Regions:
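Small-aliphatic-rich amphipathic alpha-helix that forms the alpha element of a beta-alpha
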Residues: 74-98, 119-127, 214-217, 233-241
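Active-site-proximal betaalpha loop/short-helix elements
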Residues: 108, 203-280
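Short hydrophobic/aromatic beta-strand micro-patches
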Residues: 150, 287-291
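Acidic, Ser/Thr/Pro-rich beta/coil linker or hinge segments at domain junctions
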Residues: 2-5, 13, 17, 21, ...
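Extreme N-terminal cap/leader segments of soluble proteins
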Residues: 1-73, 92, 101, 116, ...
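General beta-strand structural signal in soluble alpha/beta enzymes
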Residues: 37, 55-57, 131-135, 149, ...
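Glycine-rich anion-binding loops of enzyme active sites
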Residues: 7, 61, 97-190
Length: 329
């Protein structure tokens, strides 16, 4: 079966990447995201300071699967690509310092689209005091954005790995939960232009999620032991921590109750907003376990207990109503 040709919105005008050629596209990217480390066969990064480690992560975004040009701008796709990759670095308690881009696209892709995509990436890398240091381009029928993020983990303390949650700790979160899923539901129902007023925070959370720089580093410095980001759904992501750590995580329903905006969206669409909170994912909110009080910028949303046969993740002591999440296959 032949794939349907990718359509770019009319706001992206001018020559295509096929018109100008690979070298001109590469030069345009370098101009939009200038870095002294970009432009050679490989990027040369400074040697990390003593008593530090390098952290690396990769995520791939596919048009039609992870984003849609029907409602996301090129800048938003670029911002989202960086945020979801840097969230993985932050979730280890590390600091993002660089990113590499792998980009596949059809020949009729407007050069202006690529420039705006890179502008979105550059905006987010600057927020984290990092750089886009290189990558690769190729032609394909599908628009695919792949980011490899590189970070630095300072000091000798362990990284915030998934297997270090312990009974007696509190579960803390930094950021919204359920907003991205609610935004996606609104977009699927209305498209970008038909959404009623007041839902902009939900749309923004899906199309261009935010990540406050340094939250993972702060959590690690103040006693957090395990951390992940809410990418595949709250229950799914917490179940991974619970299984790897051999504990049970009990959510406090009062701490994660859908707020007025989620309830309004749920009423509008006829969807239980709890499904967005528990299974939505793609908020890239940081979730951590700690023996200390909630770090700055975090709030307590549950407790860690010894494991038992009932479930790895419970809410107010009982199995949650919704347990699904994002899966690639």
């Amino acid at each position: 079966m032949t794939a349907k040709p990718l359509h770019f919105p009319s706001r992206y005008t001018g020559p295509t990447v096929a018109d100008v050629g690979e070298r001109a596209v590469t030069l345009a990217i370098q101009r939009m995201a200038p870095s002294s480390r970009n432009g050679d066969d490989a990027a040369v990064l400074a040697t990390p300071a003593p008593n530090t480690r390098t952290v690396v992560s990769t995520d791939v975004l596919v048009e039609g699967r992870h984003f849609s040009l029907n409602w996301s701008s090129a800048e938003e796709v670029g911002r989202k690509a960086i945020v979801q990759n840097f969230a993985d670095i932050e979730a280890m308690g590390a600091r993002p310092v660089a990113a590499l881009l792998g980009l596949t696209m059809p020949g009729h892709t407007p050069l202006n689209f690529v420039q705006r995509l890179i502008a979105g990436m550059w905006d987010k890398t600057l927020q984290h005091n990092s750089e886009l240091v290189g990558g690769d381009l190729t032609r394909a029928d599908t628009l695919i954005v792949s980011i490899t993020a590189i970070g630095i983990l300072g000091g000798s303390s362990p990284a915030l790995t998934l297997d270090r949650a312990r009974a007696g700790q509190r579960l803390v979160a930094s950021g919204p939960i359920g907003y991205s899923a609610a935004g996606l539901a609104l977009l699927r129902h209305h498209g970008r232009t038909g959404i009623p007023a007041g839902f902009a925070p939900l749309i923004d959370a899906h199309c261009a999620p935010t990540l406050i720089p340094g939250r993972g580093v702060i959590a690690r410095a103040t006693g957090a032991t395990a951390m992940t980001d809410n990418s595949d759904g709250l229950i799914v992501d917490l179940t991974t921590i619970a299984r790897r750590s051999n504990v049970r995580i009990d959510l406090d329903s009062a701490a994660i109750t859908p707020d007025s905006l989620l309830r309004k969206a749920g009423d509008h669409l006829g969807i239980d907003p709890w499904s967005w909170v528990l299974t939505g994912g793609e908020d890239h909110t940081l979730l951590a376990t700690t023996t200390s009080d909630a770090p700055s910028g975090f709030r307590t949303i549950g407790r860690v207990h010894r494991t038992h046969a009932a479930a790895h993740v419970t809410m107010d002591g009982y199995p949650p109503t919704y347990t699904a999440g994002w899966e690639s296959f």
